[in-house]
């Protein structure tokens, strides 16, 4: 996406879309990782976790796992920073938390969590739709008038992006993010 569409969206949405595009094109992976403080990742995820319809046990699992992280790193470019938190201790609720955050708006472009404990993840179309609608609201991309649900993901022709949610109980994984 070289040029953003000519629609009535605010500067924060444009900033967020530029960061999302950088992340989705793979250019955000061109820098080296550096160890970062867990507080930085928690701060970046705070609004996101509050906005999404996670069960309270999921929010607690994320925060508990981040606070007890074995390793946390960040890498990124001018617009996007990707945080990864690993827990080697399988007693922790989450084994891995990954979040790509657009720097200017501090909005999450993509998020995934892999649980190491027996947390039940409800996987239904209505649950996925709830996550997608909350994400569009949270990211303020709900201002784009053409988001259409195609049976598995939302798609905006205006910006050429999909919004996908995976709730995988078998692999104990939750993923939410924009995709090409």
Where are these regions (language model features)?
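Exposed beta-strand-loop-beta-strand "reactive/processing" segments of non-cytosolic proteins
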Residues: 57-102, 148-180
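Short, flexible coil/linker elements and helix-boundary hinge sites characteristic
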Residues: 25, 53, 104, 136-140, ...
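N-terminal, intrinsically disordered, polar/charged segments of Gram-positive cell-envelope systems
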Residues: 1-63
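Long, charged/polar, surface-exposed segments that mediate recognition or autoinhibition
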Residues: 35, 86-148
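Serine/threonine-rich low-complexity intrinsically disordered regions
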Residues: 10-12, 17, 32, 37, ...
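Generic detector of low-complexity/intrinsically disordered segments
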Residues: 19, 26, 57, 68, ...
């Amino acid at each position: 996406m070289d040029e953003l569409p000519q629609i009535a969206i605010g500067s924060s949405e444009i900033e967020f879309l530029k960061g999302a595009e950088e992340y989705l094109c793979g250019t955000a992976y061109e820098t080296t990782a550096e160890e970062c403080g867990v507080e930085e990742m928690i701060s970046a995820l705070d609004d996101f976790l509050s906005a999404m319809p996670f069960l309270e046990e999921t929010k607690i699992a994320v925060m508990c796992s981040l606070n007890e992280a074995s390793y946390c790193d960040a890498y990124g470019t001018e617009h996007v920073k990707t945080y990864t938190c690993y827990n080697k201790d399988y007693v922790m609720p989450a084994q891995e938390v990954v979040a790509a955050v657009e720097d200017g708006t501090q909005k999450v472009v993509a998020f995934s969590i892999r649980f190491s404990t027996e947390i039940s993840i409800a996987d239904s179309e209505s649950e996925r739709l709830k996550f997608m609608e909350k994400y569009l609201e949270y990211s303020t991309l709900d201002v784009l008038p053409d988001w259409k649900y195609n049976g598995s993901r939302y798609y905006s022709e205006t910006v050429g992006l999909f919004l996908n949610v995976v709730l995988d109980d078998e692999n104990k994984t939750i993923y939410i993010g924009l995709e090409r």
